[in-house]
Amino acid sequence: MAELSDQEMLRYNRQIILRGFDFEGQEALKDARVLVVGLGGLGCAATQYLAGAGVGQLTLLDFDTVSVSNLQRQTLHSDATVGQPKVESARDALARINPHITITPVNARLDDDAMTSLIAGHSLVLDCTDNVSVRNQLNAGCYTAKVPLISGAAIRMEGQVTVFTYRENEPCYRCLSRLFGENALTCVEAGVMAPLIGVIGSLQAMEAIKLLAHYGQPASGKIVMYDAMTCQFREMKLMRNPGCEVCGQ
């Protein structure tokens, strides 16, 4: 396991002193390789905290460019980066947050084989997209590679987070997505409140840190839902579907 430098020990001191986290937890983060797919609102929120917390290697995957309409909620981007690839804008912002980590941008749309190959080289994947077909592609690749997937979604004033670890008898994302099909609304169509994006992206980062450092209980086997209108959280148990095309028998 990678050792922490003196500068890193100072930087991450508030995490290291947490009961049960210690140097081992911080070194596990430094060793980790996390793939973040989608550098919109959720991806911007999640990666800020993953970078700040000391995740050693972040791979940023997106094929979109920054537009003015993104700036309300996509906090790594700015007026100065409008027109740039999102992964490059995000990389530069994250490098300013933490110069001790490695950030690799991938400005591309990948086919299934390339996606699965990329996933297999990582410790964990964050799904920060707003596209059901891409979400299903990520789920299939993560299931094949047995790499945990943390899925987040936010629209209007509601958001949700789910962790998929692909252990025996646990559900996968397709068990969920087959319930509502391919025609889920997006933020472009329905709108979204900016701070809600920050809440859900931060929850994704927290779940990632817990998984990587074996710290706490991950939100697997359930959907954690947040209603920003009433400031209430609730959970719904997610069952594995025997007829699922990905994880079913």
UniProtKB/Swiss-Prot annotation:
GO terms assigned for molecular function: ATP binding; metal ion binding; molybdopterin-synthase adenylyltransferase activity; nucleotidyltransferase activity; sulfotransferase activity; thiosulfate-cyanide sulfurtransferase activity; ubiquitin-like modifier activating enzyme activity
Could you tell me which cysteines form disulfide bridges? none
List, alphabetically, the GO terms of the cellular component aspect: cytoplasm; cytosol
Q: Quaternary structure?
A: Homodimer. Forms a stable heterotetrameric complex of 2 MoeB and 2 MoaD during adenylation of MoaD.
Q: Note the PANTHER family from the entry.
A: MOLYBDOPTERIN-SYNTHASE ADENYLYLTRANSFERASE, UBIQUITIN-ACTIVATING ENZYME E1
Note the superkingdom of the native organism: Bacteria
**So what family is this one in?**
Belongs to the HesA/MoeB/ThiF family.
Q: What does this protein do?
A: Catalyzes the adenylation by ATP of the carboxyl group of the C-terminal glycine of sulfur carrier protein MoaD.
Gene designation per UniProt = moeB
Question: Which cofactors are required for activity?
Answer: Zn(2+)
Instruction: Please give the pathway this protein is involved in.
Output: Cofactor biosynthesis; molybdopterin biosynthesis
- EC id: 2.7.7.80
Annotated ATP binding lies at: 41, 62, 69-73, 86, 130-131
* UniProt catalytic activity: [molybdopterin-synthase sulfur-carrier protein]-C-terminal Gly-Gly + ATP + H(+) = [molybdopterin-synthase sulfur-carrier protein]-C-terminal Gly-Gly-AMP + diphosphate
Q: How is the cofactor bound?
A: Binds 1 zinc ion per subunit.
According to UniProt, the name of this protein is Molybdopterin-synthase adenylyltransferase
> Its Gene Ontology biological processes?
Mo-molybdopterin cofactor biosynthetic process
Residues the record lists as binding Zn(2+):
172, 175, 244, 247
Q: Which UniProt keywords apply?
A: ATP-binding, Metal-binding, Molybdenum cofactor biosynthesis, Nucleotide-binding, Nucleotidyltransferase, Transferase, Zinc
